[in-house]
From Swiss-Prot:
<dbReference type="GO" id="GO:0009535">
    <property type="term" value="C:chloroplast thylakoid membrane"/>
</dbReference>
<dbReference type="GO" id="GO:0017004">
    <property type="term" value="P:cytochrome complex assembly"/>
</dbReference>
<dbReference type="GO" id="GO:0015979">
    <property type="term" value="P:photosynthesis"/>
</dbReference>
<keyword id="KW-0602">Photosynthesis</keyword>
<feature type="transmembrane region" description="Helical">
    <location>
        <begin position="3"/>
        <end position="23"/>
    </location>
</feature>
<dbReference type="GO" id="GO:0045158">
    <property type="term" value="F:electron transporter, transferring electrons within cytochrome b6/f complex of photosystem II activity"/>
</dbReference>
<comment type="similarity">
    <text>Belongs to the PetN family.</text>
</comment>
<keyword id="KW-0150">Chloroplast</keyword>
<keyword id="KW-0813">Transport</keyword>
<keyword id="KW-1133">Transmembrane helix</keyword>
<dbReference type="InterPro" id="IPR036143">
    <property type="entry name" value="Cytochr_b6-f_cplx_su8_sf"/>
</dbReference>
<protein>
    <recommendedName>
        <fullName>Cytochrome b6-f complex subunit 8</fullName>
    </recommendedName>
</protein>
<dbReference type="Pfam" id="PF03742">
    <property type="entry name" value="PetN"/>
</dbReference>
<comment type="function">
    <text>Component of the cytochrome b6-f complex, which mediates electron transfer between photosystem II (PSII) and photosystem I (PSI), cyclic electron flow around PSI, and state transitions.</text>
</comment>
<dbReference type="GO" id="GO:0009512">
    <property type="term" value="C:cytochrome b6f complex"/>
</dbReference>
<keyword id="KW-0812">Transmembrane</keyword>
<keyword id="KW-0793">Thylakoid</keyword>
Amino acid sequence: MDSVTIAWAALMAISTFSLSLVVRGRSGL
């Protein structure tokens, strides 16, 4: 795999994880 592909995949994963955490936190509170 290319390093750029890995970096892009990691960025997408972190963004999705952060977004889900924010939504879950707001709905939870």
